[in-house]
Curated annotation (Swiss-Prot):
Broadest EC class assigned to this enzyme: transferase
Family annotation (Pfam families): DXP_synthase_N, Transket_pyr, Transketolase_C
Protein name: 1-deoxy-D-xylulose-5-phosphate synthase
Lineage: Bacteria, Pseudomonadati, Pseudomonadota, Gammaproteobacteria, Thiotrichales
Organism, as annotated: Francisella philomiragia subsp. philomiragia (strain ATCC 25017 / CCUG 19701 / FSC 153 / O#319-036)
Cellular component aspect of the GO annotation: cytosol
């Protein structure tokens, strides 16, 4: 007999609506069990979905999806949503080659109303949908589900301000898992939340306002009393000042109460915000105790046979070690990150130097300009940021840092392909969008040792500098004391004939493999900006074929920089140039090796091109 007696009957929200309300609590339990069993095989984002289980059930139970629009923020919490919207049997393929995405994706399901992966976008998207539907005569509901972390992003506040200002009919659900369901959320507060979300209260409240508006002093007095009374229990004032009708906080794990409240709010017109309190990792004891550790789980995490982590240090570890060692030597060093402490390996730094560590939350724009302010007053800020999130601070990088030539070092993690997380998290574009900015140094280390020493060089450089490095473990290169890296100078790694590979970054082992078979020259270029023009001149004079190699976008990338120099200096007459990098498209999720091969960044794909060119050159 199946242990999923209710869930087995559900494939779509239409099936869910047939479940008696009294069985929803049991359904939530089955969903959690199914999630544990499935991710124990596949791995994936875990704790967030556990925390949003009842909320997800209630949303699809009350609203008419996909006619009504549910927009999820970030997307880590959407595995239960995927289970309930026709992808239950595919969940085991999540983030795998050819499987479903780990995030909402419009091309995957009509229930995924808006593609996401980055933070703080949901309210803006839901507001746009609400207005579009209204203008086209469609009587739908638009709901944004946003977490307490994501709502700290400036874009979320911009959207709240807009929605409240125009009084658009939109529901924002604040999924707050920062606090537990404690006494101040239960008891009087829960009772008060029930009262203020009730239809009778709403009716009396609105009709009373109309009457009292004719008596201005009395209206202001009553309004003040209501605000102060609610303020005793809930953080209503801020959202109501923005024009939202605030309800909550309520228990986000009481599915019956959620259903009741959502039904009431569905009929309440105008901007409204429902504040729900949840516990990340709910229902799985270890995840409740350590939600950060169980944010994402590996296969066999539950059965106890999970694979051990790689013994080699990751590039993030190299950065984490470097910044702690450098901070011990230079009191000017300060670390800045937009909510990436764990991912960027800044935990130890934050513990050793708490007064010099600044986590500015999900606020990439602020992080960069804040770093500029620190630099103006004589400190040396190191901004630890993922490549994909650096995109969000582009104007600040140009206007606030580069234009003023401020002394800021960007430690750009997750540069290149990230594999299972897919296009929303790939670091494909940082070289392209940073290369065109004056006053910038861009470094592409080929291994851990170069990463360490380029961080050192970037720190000592006076002006904006960027070191980009990939996700995951390196090749195991030892960190030495005597690596000689000079600004803008490449390194000749192997000397061959006819063919040269100009490598930018950690694909150097691939270049060396090709060199071993075809006796070709390999250059570790190290710098995209400034380019080693002397090395390029030398290569073009002594070779017939030049390949550039990078794990970043070909369009505007390092290879493009080489092309520009070659053609600007009339060096192309006797040589053939080919650029190898990421194609001009958004890649899907999958294993990194598969994605590299698809991008022609594999031994066989490059060798095929090389052999064709060599045969034509004979």
């Amino acid at each position: 007999m199946s242990k999923y007696t209710i869930l087995d009957k559900i494939n779509t929200p239409s099936d869910l609506k047939l479940v008696p309300e009294g069985q929803l609590k049991e359904l939530a339990s089955e969903l959690r069990t199914f999630l544990v069993d499935t991710l124990d095989v596949s791995g994936g984002h875990f704790a967030s979905s556990l925390g949003a289980t009842e909320l997800t059930v209630a949303l699809h139970y009350v609203f008419n999806t996909p006619y009504d629009n549910i927009v999820w923020d970030v997307g880590h919490q959407t595995y239960i949503h995927k289970i309930l919207t026709g992808r239950k049997d595919k969940l085991i393929t999540i983030k795998k080659d050819g499987g479903i995405s780990g995030f909402p994706k419009r091309s995957e399901s009509e229930y995924d109303t808006f593609g996401v992966g980055h933070s703080s976008t949901s309210i803006s998207a839901a507001l746009g949908m609400a207005i579009a539907d209204r203008l086209q005569g469609k009587h739908s509901s638009s709901i944004a589900v946003i977490g307490d972390g994501a709502i700290t992003g400036g874009m979320a506040f911009e959207a709240l301000n807009h929605a409240g200002g125009i009084k658009e009919d939109i529901l924002v659900i604040l999924n707050d898992n920062e606090m537990s369901i404690s006494d101040n959320v239960g008891g009087l507060s829960a009772h008060f939340s029930k009262i203020i979300s009730g239809g009778f209260y709403n009716s009396i409240r609105e009709k009373g306002k109309e009457v009292l508006k004719n008596i201005p002093p009395m209206f202001e007095f009553v309004k003040k009393i209501e605000t102060q009374t609610k303020g005793m229990f809930v953080p209503a004032n801020f959202f109501e000042d923005l024009g939202f009708y605030y309800v909550g906080p309520i228990d986000g794990h009481n599915v019956v109460e959620l259903v009741k409240t959502l039904r009431i709010l569905k009929d309440h017109k105008g901007p409204k915000l429902l504040h729900v309190i949840t516990k990340k990792g709910k229902g799985y004891t270890k995840a409740e105790s350590d939600p950060i550790k169980f944010h994402h789980v590996a296969p066999s995490f539950h059965s106890g046979d999970a694979q051990s982590k790689a013994s080699k240090p990751t590039y993030s570890n190299i950065f984490g070690n470097w910044i702690c060692q450098k901070a011990a030597k230079d009191k000017r060093l300060v670390g800045v990150t937009p909510a990436m402490k764990e991912g960027s390996d800044l935990i130890r730094f934050s513990q050793q130097y708490p007064n010099r560590y600044f986590d500015v939350a999900i606020a990439e724009q602020h992080a960069v300009t804040f770093a500029g302010g620190l630099a103006c007053q004589g400190l040396k800020p190191v901004v630890a940021i993922y490549s994909t999130f650096l995109q969000r601070a582009y104007d600040q990088v140009i206007h606030d840092i580069a234009l003023q030539d401020l002394d800021v070092l960007y430690a750009v993690d997750r540069a290149g392909l990230v594999g299972a997380d897919g296009a929303t998290h790939d670091g494909s574009f940082d070289i392209s969008f940073m290369r065109c900015i004056p006053n910038h140094v861009i470094m592409t280390p080929s291994d851990e040792n170069e990463t360490y020493h380029m961080l050192e060089l970037g720190y000592e450089y006076k002006g904006p500098a960027m070191v980009r490095y990939p996700r995951g473990a390196g090749i195991g290169a030892e960190i030495t004391d005597n690596l000689d890296i000079k600004l803008g100078k490449a390194k000749l790694v192997k000397k061959g004939s006819r063919v040269a590979i100009l490598n930018f970054g950690t694909l150097l082992p691939l270049a060396n493999q090709l060199a071993d078979k075809y006796h070709i020259t390999v250059v570790d270029m190290r710098f995209v900006k400034p380019l080693d023009e002397q090395m390029i001149n030398q290569i073009c004079q002594n070779h017939n074929i030049v390949f550039t190699l990078e794990e970043s976008s070909i369009a505007g990338g390092a290879g493009s920089a080489v092309n520009e120099y070659i053609f600007a200096n009339d060096l192309s007459k006797n040589i053939t140039v080919r650029n190898f990098g990421l194609k001009d498209e958004f890649l899907t999720h999958g294993t990194k090796d598969l994605l590299l091969d698809y991008s022609n960044l594999s031994f066989n794909k490059i060798a095929e091109v090389l052999e064709k060119l060599l045969s034509h050159k004979k």
